[in-house]
């Protein structure tokens, strides 16, 4: 692993919390995200659980809907992989904000889902705000605790 990989790993290790914004890209994770993971994972500190217990918010968007019971159920190969990486490999505490149907209003074939997409958007925005407030609150507590040490 080169100096660039160590610098990326240092950023992860030094962070109080992480916010990862990763869209579904052609039913998987984008190549640059996979490359970033591969470079950071080469650092033994990351592979050794240096992020155990660290809060991570994964914000992800999907153009369609790949949930149970939909015609393309199981086509999301990004979110499950990211869960494995963040929870099982890194040992971090994962919170997911996922918004489906971002192509409604763009792709005419999805127009029938306009109302559902609006509901999904509202729910995702509310969940994102909740997680953001939680991270901010927890960060303030940690800074106060550290200042008192």
Language-model-derived ranges and their functions:
Residues 1-2, 121:
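A conditional alpha-helix N-cap/helix-loop micro-motif detector
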Residues 3-80:
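Helix-loop-strand module that forms the ligand-binding subsite of alpha/beta enzymes
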Residues 72-73, 82-149:
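Glycine-rich phosphate/pyrophosphate-binding loop and the adjoining helix
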